[in-house]
């Protein structure tokens, strides 16, 4: 029997009332994964034996009635370090690496009774927006297996949208949670920068990376954010701010809420069908009592250029540690030390990772630093100021999550610029360190369209309040791909 249509609150009730055991639920989840995996390739590793052992231990001690996540399975993106479980970031260079420690979020999952059931596929080192850059295998879109699932958290989105798991963790550097959530018709949140510890997250761009939850519904998303948030002394960028109950405003009226609609988010490059769905969603929020007004974020058009300079520069620095000596892939038949470095990195990193390392190295070079990296930092400040100005008058910003719905597998592989532009609307949120969510808001040619809601720093509750109000009065989140029922 499959339980994939039940929320974690409903599953919790079944577990507390002993209508099902954690072991039975875990076995059902493993069956769901086995049935769907051949079509979507969301998982890189399923930790069946470990998961069953943990479930049996939970049954032995008894379900905690006060912890809604106790005994529930979760999938974890493969750039989040898990002790004793191979963690590769979907890269050949980390093949076979078994971490001796847990990421802080992995410990928090265990402390909340969540069972890590496997590691999820992704674009290599989280570099990519389609899911095609995994060095192992590409994940497929659950609505149409000829389409991309989005990236880089491709497996995190596909595993939830297909009904393999109810919950997953991803990471978001320029849209890597929100974009695949949009493409697969689920809920994905990038929390405020510093809200969730990055200790144990394999670094891509340290000033932009953030771990976040992907779920079928808004409430489950907030429940998972409750688990993973909080200050961590092991992460110097972790914020020591109080952590609220993120579900506290769910169900509250949104009458009088002021929502900004940036004109730049509906301009050139935005598909007409996507635009139509998002403007209809804005009208729907007006009917619920929100005040929606057009604003301008004038520097957002520079976001993609700024991002690819800053992110690539940080990546070129972060990825220096993969040298073929300390851990990971080591080339054979080498002549000297330099040859070891060159061959190990050339053979171990995929083409997109190499492209970004070269771009970053160029941006940081003596002749380009002022012209590129320094200038990008200055424009980043202008983007931050644009958001701050809008948030003086408005509670939230609304727009499409992506300019288009999912495209064909392989269609943009040889055109990196068109691939990069897919993150046009999500990147500014990372540059400003703000929280942003994608929720299902319609369909374009049978493929899901996501609506993005952007909030003030540390105000995820208001995002969840408005997202839940929209979800409760629409049925987009209830629509499921054919694969879900298999």
Curated annotation (Swiss-Prot):
What Gene Ontology molecular-function terms does this entry list? ATP binding; glutaminyl-tRNA synthase (glutamine-hydrolyzing) activity
What SUPFAM superfamilies has UniProt attached to this entry?
Amidase signature (AS) enzymes
Q: Which domain of life is it from?
A: Bacteria
Q: Which reaction does it catalyse?
A: L-glutamyl-tRNA(Gln) + L-glutamine + ATP + H2O = L-glutaminyl-tRNA(Gln) + L-glutamate + ADP + phosphate + H(+)
One Pfam family matching this protein: Amidase
Instruction: Write down the InterPro entries for this protein, in alphabetical order.
Output: Amidase, Amidase_CS, Amidase_dom, AS_sf, GatA
RNA-binding in keyword set: no
Among PROSITE patterns, the record links this protein to:
AMIDASES
Which terms in the GO cellular component ontology are assigned?
glutamyl-tRNA(Gln) amidotransferase complex
List UniProt keywords, sorted A-Z.
ATP-binding, Ligase, Nucleotide-binding, Protein biosynthesis
Identify the EC number(s): 6.3.5.7
What are the BP-aspect GO terms? translation
**What residues sit in the active site?**
77, 152, 176
* Extent of the signal sequence: none
Statement: the UniProt record of this protein carries the keyword Ligase = yes
SUBUNIT field: Heterotrimer of A, B and C subunits.
What does the sequence similarity comment in the record state about its family? Belongs to the amidase family. GatA subfamily.
This molecule's function is given as:
Allows the formation of correctly charged Gln-tRNA(Gln) through the transamidation of misacylated Glu-tRNA(Gln) in organisms which lack glutaminyl-tRNA synthetase. The reaction takes place in the presence of glutamine and ATP through an activated gamma-phospho-Glu-tRNA(Gln).
What protein name is recorded for this chain?
Glutamyl-tRNA(Gln) amidotransferase subunit A
Q: Gene encoding it?
A: gatA
